[in-house]
């Protein structure tokens, strides 16, 4: 240990605070907290204790500097540690998924007819609103929304649509919503549905079942059979939900049970969420390179995890976390009620801890098996594509344009087989006029590689969405910048990036393929040439047309490589390519919408660029501006009654053009990176999991730096 570091250790104060350990390059590798900085930090280097823990030996060769921040209390140290971990993202601290990946259900009870909205967990919580969650997967929130909206019949439309709707939507026709937006639904009746939904979401199904049974019997006695049938369906749905939940405790309390399993530097923290004595949810959180003591890891995890979800009455933990009392105070303050951290040694609660530990071990095994399959897929991909190394860091680039207008490029990143959304980028094509995909790709790849050279980091593999022509354009960009695309024989450690092109499957025809089978809607079958099949498809037939496989083009090779269908290697590439396509087309649609918005507003006298941007930010779509009242427009930044009246009069004059057929009726599909969180469009509720993930991806990328 150098003299400067030894001096800092000798001068550490015996006060509460946080410490930041840095490596020899000055990067923060660990953040910790302590009630006494002197005691905690010196314990890592106390040779007299004969400490053989792995992290002690690790620090001796890694640590380059130490920084401490003194706080006024232990509770303040807990809060500061949380912020420092999120800011520096240290290598050896537990790091939960980015909080924008977690989603919650919000119920604004200030509205007379509230609805459930999907929100990001990091959104500032509003007074008067209730939050349920967080949900870490799209499938779980989709199932919950489907259940609640179907059986408790809460409205799904946004407040803006609610205020302006003139006739009920299809949900009213199929008896999924009472249409309070159009009809006079008694507020007390709707409020009862809201209370039922809240009890269901909070896990208090027992109370709900008893009340539903009573109301159903009352409706039947009053000969209100339609109401009784609706209540019966609600009751059956709740009872089916109860059958899926395992009762683990008889006291019907709310508690989370934390399990921890560790092998070497890798560990899994398991959270079993119990509400009213029943197991409601189970989440496994895997972490790598966790060399520090388990009590420190657990303390950091609890502080981060309960930042965006309400802590229950009790949290059962397998060991006492660092500064447990201060941590409990922080969690209680966030919740507004007392939260207890307990470490039971015997009895039913100790048995729950054992269940959580065994679940953590099972999660650990599944996590490592997944890692092994991913490693095999990357190795197989490298072998199939003749790559110099397994592509642990892959990027894919795609172009989206409409007849050469508003051309944009997208770059998505994948590390170790998982999306790396911090490195997603959007590009506006600047130097190419007209429809020239090759030149556009050349520009986008040039800008990407120029930035990579400045940062000193190159991905292992760049995948181009396209065939041989698109690949050659990207290779030319690399050559122009002097970026090697193969390892140097004389200097194997020199950086390089490999490039391939992935061409989509396509309809094919030819003598070798014979004919394509065409299946009619009513089960009839016919044989037709491919040209006839296309005509038949237009007339309502579904054609099973022959398609070529996905093809991978390699530099310097005439024929493409065809990967085995349904293989893990092809799945990795196709998943990366499809994500690049989604990201590009979403950005293109956003720009096209903004252009259409601006072109219409240019005709309004007295509305400058600043007010146009303010309208776009506030309403998001032309249709919303058309439907807005002068009072609503006046609420936009920079608008007064006079400007609001001018905008309203422009859209409601006798010769005003009708709304375009494709004019969006909801919020923009993508918001600028780092922009405010939007409610997920209602249509996403019934969509596939992939579509909901896309709806949640409005903030997944950083803006592309100026080239």
Swiss-Prot record:
Q: Does the keyword Cell wall biogenesis/degradation apply?
A: no
Supply the SUPFAM superfamilies for this chain: C-terminal UvrC-binding domain of UvrB, GIY-YIG endonuclease, RuvA domain 2-like
Q: Which GO terms describe its biological process?
A: nucleotide-excision repair; SOS response
* PANTHER family per UniProt: UVRABC SYSTEM PROTEIN C (PTHR30562:SF1), UVRC/OXIDOREDUCTASE (PTHR30562)
The root-end lineage is:
Bacteria, Pseudomonadati, Myxococcota, Myxococcia, Myxococcales
Q: What is this protein called?
A: UvrABC system protein C
Q: Which CDD domains match?
A: GIY-YIG_UvrC_Cho (cd10434)
Predominant subcellular localization, coarse grouping: cytoplasm
